[in-house]
């Protein structure tokens, strides 16, 4: 006891010096707290406060110890002089769900009427009851208090007893001009602290503005709630930590939940879709409105029901809250609590023979004269058990495949615990360790040791550090025409559809097997024509924003930003026979368009080829000891069933799109690349070289070949171009996306070529692409095959171009961006005659002696 108190008080002081609260108690610490309460009256008051306020809820390990102790007190099996049986029952009711539910159900039958009533009162506000609902329903036939609990749920008292949003909200503006991406709000270099919300929040905006801590603290002294305001807010990664940081600074404490806050206000001219959804999930109020007349320090009034923002009693901006259920979401403390609670209310009403509840806002049916459905609308419809879902409709589709990666995995674990779940209902949940494998910190090593078991115990599948990028694996676990999600903005399946999400929604999807969705509109990109020699899939990726800019559907300028793709589904057709790895290049880059999702219309043949390969991969995973075996077997069997009877959904010819962009690939005669530092700022090779302003530098310091945007063909092509050439003129990084690619490249002799070229080869994974571990040199000019090139992402002050591996090889040889002629000559000389050999893909079922 003494050691615990000394150690704990020391840690409190250490964190207080940083301006943050102590960490929540772990299981051993809770055991020590219980011992103090039972044996040490001198420190009992302090220990009681810790037990009440410093233990995470749900199925956290500490919550188990807390619930078991309180249950013994509530049931009078144990006496504590500092917590009565009645108070113990009350405290059980603060734990949200999980380990506290069974003791409260037992309490309904207590001989002590006060404890029985208190148990009922606690259960009325407990939403995370899952299978225990049936137990309470059965009890209600003979137990009046159990029936009272059901009636309370049926009447949505848990919701109606919460205060609705005020008619007028006074707030102080904290404004970041231009674009704020999620790396600004949650820097990759601090990814290892993400699950420690208060500590991670200290890094918010440190790379974006000067004196960031003083500026944030100064705005909090205004005495009114703070609204985070920006022209464009939340682009980039799906990291919920970005939202957590805003809420930590500007939100409200959650009673009995340590180190977490909810609420807060975000106002943006454009709010990226994943970030918007994460705000919804967390109980924040996201508002899309013109912000040009809002300045930092302004005291504004927000009228959420009227849709007006006033400054000095003058209307300076108007808005319409969307989705229609947003006010309910805020009232319920978030979209996820609303969905769970609404489901509980409906279940109780059905059991009691009551009609539909009138307590909640019902989404209106979408107003549309559409007669047909797009491919995306049909896939989502299929996941909902209907023919299609039109834009504007609210739905909760079944989720077939869920992905979680390591820099968000610890947060997802915390969210799963908070959801009080011990089993995943989603058929396939995959956890990777791709972002922290290369240069793990002690916290990463701990995560590598503890997270796999947490996932596999719940029926998920855990990869190993060094296996490679999550998307390379998760794509191979997908099924045609099904829906998925993942805690990474590049969760963009090349088959079916996936809606990336923050860690909270990923946990919800894994736990429940469903996810909420307000169906977005679709933008159709239709390719036609034949590709010219030297033109790559990556050039087609960059052609999408290039042609959108031409049509006035996309602007690079952030103020008054136009982006036809933002929040919509990108649907791509016209390339029906490309391989799945190539299709992923297209779907993956929809993240940089800020699209909600992407579908690529393909023929059956590439899908059959891909699934046959993936069946072999799963067989080898099982043979190599990957867990959970049953989950892997079920997914393999589902793949085989589709291969045996392959049927694909098709879009209707009369489907409607928000916009149609047609791209004749024959018009593309030279590479297209994204320029520093914006994935929307695309230009042809000639246009880049013609730019003498200095914004598009021509000398290249470093070249990176890697990320989820690459496949084995890119590395062979790169190798062939640099083969037998003098060592690279630029610092060179080579990082295959998976250990399977790495081994095959070694077997084929390409690693020897990379070494001779002076390349630094890394563990398969995401390190340099994300910039959370390896970094390019400060102020370097970089050519990269990676996903995005936001300021400071790959290195402080770095200027980063994005393009193909083939163009990267030319940059490496020359130390500069080549001319069109130089590039075409290299490709023609080195690649053209052996294209079939170079651009072969990883068909494991056809590879001799393939083993993991």
UniProtKB/Swiss-Prot annotation:
Query: Quick check: keyword Hydrolase in the entry?
Result: no
Q: Which reaction does it catalyse?
A: citrate = D-threo-isocitrate; (2S,3R)-3-hydroxybutane-1,2,3-tricarboxylate = 2-methyl-cis-aconitate + H2O
Cofactor(s) needed, names only, are:
[4Fe-4S] cluster
Q: Which GO terms describe its molecular function?
A: 2-methylisocitrate dehydratase activity; 4 iron, 4 sulfur cluster binding; aconitate hydratase activity; metal ion binding; mRNA 3'-UTR binding; mRNA binding
Annotated substrate binding lies at 194, 237-239, 405-407, 489, 788, 793
Q: Where does [4Fe-4S] cluster bind?
A: 708, 766, 769
Report the superkingdom from the record. Answer: Bacteria
Biological or metabolic pathway of the protein:
Carbohydrate metabolism; tricarboxylic acid cycle; isocitrate from oxaloacetate: step 2/2; Organic acid metabolism; propanoate degradation
**Gene3D superfamilies this protein is in?**
Aconitase, Domain 2 (3.40.1060.10), Aconitase, domain 3 (3.30.499.10), Aconitase, domain 4 (3.20.19.10), Aconitate B, HEAT-like domain (1.25.40.310)
InterPro entries, per this entry? Acnase/IPM_dHydase_lsu_aba_1/3, Acoase/IPM_deHydtase_lsu_aba, Aconitase/3IPM_dehydase_swvl, Aconitase/IPM_isomerase, Aconitase_4Fe-4S_BS, Aconitase_4Fe-4S_dom, Aconitase_B, Aconitase_B_HEAT-like_dom
Provide GO CC annotations from the record.
Answer: cytosol
Instruction: Extract the Pfam families matched here.
Output: Aconitase (PF00330), Aconitase_2_N (PF06434), Aconitase_B_N (PF11791)
Q: How is the cofactor bound?
A: Binds 1 [4Fe-4S] cluster per subunit.
The EC number(s) given in the record are 4.2.1.3, 4.2.1.99
One GO biological process term is: propionate catabolic process, 2-methylcitrate cycle
Instruction: Provide the alphabetized UniProt keywords.
Output: 4Fe-4S, Iron, Iron-sulfur, Lyase, Metal-binding, RNA-binding, Tricarboxylic acid cycle
Role summary: Involved in the catabolism of short chain fatty acids (SCFA) via the tricarboxylic acid (TCA)(acetyl degradation route) and probably via the 2-methylcitrate cycle I (propionate degradation route). Catalyzes the reversible isomerization of citrate to isocitrate via cis-aconitate. Catalyzes the hydration of 2-methyl-cis-aconitate to yield (2R,3S)-2-methylisocitrate. The apo form of AcnB functions as a RNA-binding regulatory protein.
Q: What family is this protein classified in?
A: Belongs to the aconitase/IPM isomerase family.
Describe its assembly.
Answer: Monomer.
The name on file for this protein is: Aconitate hydratase B
Per the UniProt record, the source organism is Helicobacter pylori (strain J99 / ATCC 700824) (Campylobacter pylori J99)
């Amino acid at each position: 006891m003494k050691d615990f108190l000394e150690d704990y008080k020391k840690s409190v002081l250490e964190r207080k010096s940083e301006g943050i609260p102590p960490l929540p108690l772990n299981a051993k610490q809770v055991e020590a707290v219980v011992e103090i309460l039972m044996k040490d009256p001198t420190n009992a008051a302090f220990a009681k406060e810790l037990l009440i306020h410093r233990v995470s809820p749900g199925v956290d390990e500490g919550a188990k110890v807390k619930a078991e102790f309180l249950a013994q007190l509530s049931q009078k099996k144990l006496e504590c002089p500092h917590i009565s049986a009645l108070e113990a029952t009350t405290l059980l009711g603060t734990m949200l769900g999980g380990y506290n539910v069974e003791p409260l159900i037992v309490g309904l039958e207590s001989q002590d009427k006060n404890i029985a009533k208190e148990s009922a009162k606690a259960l009325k506000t407990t939403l995370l009851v899952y299978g225990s609902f049936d137990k309470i329903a059965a009890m209600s036939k003979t137990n009046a208090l159990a029936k009272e609990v059901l009636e309370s749920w049926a009447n949505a008292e848990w919701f109606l007893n919460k205060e609705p949003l005020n008619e007028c909200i006074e707030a102080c503006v904290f404004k970041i001009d231009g674009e704020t991406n999620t790396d600004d709000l949650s820097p990759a270099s601090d990814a290892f602290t993400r699950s420690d919300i208060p500590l991670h929040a200290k890094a918010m905006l440190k790379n974006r503005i000067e004196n960031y801590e003083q500026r944030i603290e100064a705005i909090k002294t205004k005495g009114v709630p703070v609204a985070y305001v920006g022209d464009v807010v939340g682009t980039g990664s799906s990291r919920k930590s970005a939202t957590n940081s805003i809420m930590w600074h500007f939100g409200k404490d959650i009673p009995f939940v340590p180190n977490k806050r909810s609420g807060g206000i975000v106002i943006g001219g454009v709010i990226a879709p994943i970030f918007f959804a994460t705000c919804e999930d967390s109980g924040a109020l996201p508002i899309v409105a013109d912000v040009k007349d809002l300045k930092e320090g302004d005291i504004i009034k927000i009228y959420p029901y009227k849709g007006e923002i006033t400054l000095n009693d003058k209307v300076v901006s108007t808005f319409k809250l969307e989705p229609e259920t947003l006010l309910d979401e805020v009232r319920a403390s978030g979209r996820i609590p609303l969905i769970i609670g609404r489901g509980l209310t409906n279940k109780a009403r059905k059991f009691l023979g009551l009609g539909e509840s009138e307590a909640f806002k019902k989404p209106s049916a979408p107003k549309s004269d559409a007669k047909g459905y797009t491919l995306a609308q049909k896939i989502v419809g299929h996941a909902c058990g209907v023919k299609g879902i039109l834009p504007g409709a609210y739905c909760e589709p079944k989720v077939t495949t869920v992905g979680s990666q390591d820099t968000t995995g610890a947060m997802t674990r915390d969210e799963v615990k908070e959801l009080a779940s011990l089993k995943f209902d989603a058929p396939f949940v995959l956890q990777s360790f791709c972002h922290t494998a290369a240069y793990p910190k002690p916290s990463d090593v701990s995560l590598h040791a503890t997270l796999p078991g947490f996932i596999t115990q719940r029926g998920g599948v855990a990869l190993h550090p060094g296996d490679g990028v999550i998307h390379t694996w998760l794509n191979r676990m997908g099924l045609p025409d099904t829906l998925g999600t993942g805690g990474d903005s590049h969760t963009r399946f090349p088959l079916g559809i996936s809606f990336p999400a923050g860690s909270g929604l990923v946990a919800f999807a894994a736990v429940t097997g469903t996810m909420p969705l307000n169906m977005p509109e679709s933008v159709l990109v239709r390719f036609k024509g034949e590709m010219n020699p030297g033109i790559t899939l990556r050039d087609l990726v960059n052609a999408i924003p290039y042609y959108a800019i031409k049509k006035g559907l996309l602007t690079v300028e952030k103020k008054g930003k136009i982006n036809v793709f933002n929040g919509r589904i990108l649907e791509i057709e016209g390339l029906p026979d490309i391989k799945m790895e190539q299709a992923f290049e297209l779907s993956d880059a929809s993240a940089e368009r800020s699209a909600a999702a992407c579908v690529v219309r393909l023929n059956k043949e590439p899908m059959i080829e891909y699934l046959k390969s993936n069946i072999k991969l799963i067989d080898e995973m099982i043979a190599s000891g990957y867990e959970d075996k049953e989950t892997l077997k079920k997914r393999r069997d589902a793949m085989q069933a589709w291969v045996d009877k392959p049927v694909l959904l098709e879009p209707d010819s009369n489907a409607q799109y928000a916009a149609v962009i047609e791209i004749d690939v024959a018009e593309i005669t030279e590479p297209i690349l994204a320029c520093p530092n914006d994935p929307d700022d695309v230009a042809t090779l000639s246009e880049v070289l013609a730019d003498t302003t200095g914004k598009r530098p021509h000398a290249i310091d470093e070249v990176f070949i890697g990320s989820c945007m690459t496949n084995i063909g890119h590395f062979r092509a790169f190798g062939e171009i640099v083969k037998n050439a003098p060592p690279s003129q630029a610092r060179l990084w080579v990082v295959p996306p998976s250990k399977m690619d790495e081994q095959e490249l070694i077997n084929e002799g390409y690693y020897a070529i990379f070494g001779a070229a002076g390349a630094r080869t890394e563990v398969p994974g995401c390190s340099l692409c994300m910039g959370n571990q390896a970094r390019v040199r400060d102020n370097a000019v970089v050519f990269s095959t990676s996903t995005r090139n936001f300021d400071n992402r790959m290195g402080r002050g770095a200027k980063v171009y994005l393009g193909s591996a083939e163009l990267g090889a030319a940059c490496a040889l020359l130390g500069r961006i080549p001319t069109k002629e130089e590039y075409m000559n290299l490709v023609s000389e080195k690649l053209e005659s052996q294209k079939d050999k170079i651009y072969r893909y990883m068909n494991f079922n056809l590879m001799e002696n393939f083993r993991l």
